[in-house]
Amino acid sequence: KKELNRIIGREIENTLEKEVEFEKQDIVINVDLRKEPKVRIQINPLFIEGKYNKLVRGIPQTKWPCGKCKGKGCEECNFTGKQYRESVEELLSEPILEATNGWQAKFHGAGREDIDVLMLGSGRPFVLEIKEPKIRKINLDA
């Protein structure tokens, strides 16, 4: 098994001109040689840490499903499935998902906040988890 890992790693390095990192992997390639050979590629999540300020009241921290339809979409929510038009989670997630070509974003906020409060000062810490990002290096200053 170790020899096969070494051979596959060397081939990937030569083909992609990238150095294989065995300790902190961005991508894991599983090769199953029992019976019919199978290759499975696992793209590990990308974690982005930051702080946000909320300068306007009326924006929830996380996406809030419509109380009537529970997120499915109805006349009351204008078929959006959302109680509120936008959230801090969506405002942060959408441009990052687009930049990374990720599959899904998961917002991890440090603490909760009411919808009618501001978040001033040094900001509220958060971690944004991007699942299956195709692009891992992005300009966060943009």
Cite the ranges covered by each PLM segment:
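Catalytic/RNA-binding core of pseudouridine synthases
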Residues: 1-142
